[in-house]
Amino acid sequence: AEAVLYKYPTYEERTVICCSTQSGCPVGCRFCGAGNYFVRSFKAEEIVYQVDYCLESQDIDASKIQNFQIMVMSMGEPLLNFKELEKAFEILYTKYPNAKLLISSIGPKIDYEPVIAMCERIPTVGLQFSVHESTDEARNKLIPFDKKLTLKEISEVGEVFLARTGRKPFFNYCAHEENGSKEDADKILELFNPNVFEATISVICEVDESIADANDRQRELAS
């Protein structure tokens, strides 16, 4: 399993853990190294262990963390392993009630009723969709996984999520040289109502590229 622990600037002030739900990934996003292979889905205990290990390895007292986030957004598509993810979140919510839990997903074509029901039951769970492009055509090239929601369908799921939980869902958009025009922004605004969705903007980090280099590219795009 791959898990990443972030510190901003001290663990007590803010701790973010990104953990995996699968070994490899069946989705095959073109920018992701994990998409080249898929081995298996993790059990709930294996997902929870990643969080426990990150905290214990750095001797972090989770109860003292002021801003604590646990995100399933490393290897794997979490909603293609939902039964085990649900069990893992139930355990994590019990062990770390001060942690915000986040599902980051490309939006596979599944039944979202159990997902939203879990988010109603566990009040710390957030939902983020990896949108990345302003049209389905461009997104299909970046994420060539057939069994996924369209952008319009993602928007509709987000509206249901807000209505049922009272919490805004997120969409993530990877900015690059070819999708940052005003026309792209207008398309995104038409699809994802700001009264419903929160937006996060990121940059695609190539497999052989450092995070620092990727950040430099994002700053260039934003300037």
Predicted regions and their residues:
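Conserved AdoMet/S-adenosylmethionine-binding subsite of the radical SAM
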Residues: 56-69, 74-222
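Generic structural motif recognizing short loop/turn segments at the entrances and edges of beta-strands
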Residues: 1, 13-15, 123
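Canonical Radical SAM [4Fe-4S] cluster-binding loop centered on the CxxxCxxC motif
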Residues: 7-49, 53
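A short loop-to-beta-strand scaffold at the N-terminal edge of the catalytic core in hydrolase folds
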Residues: 2-6
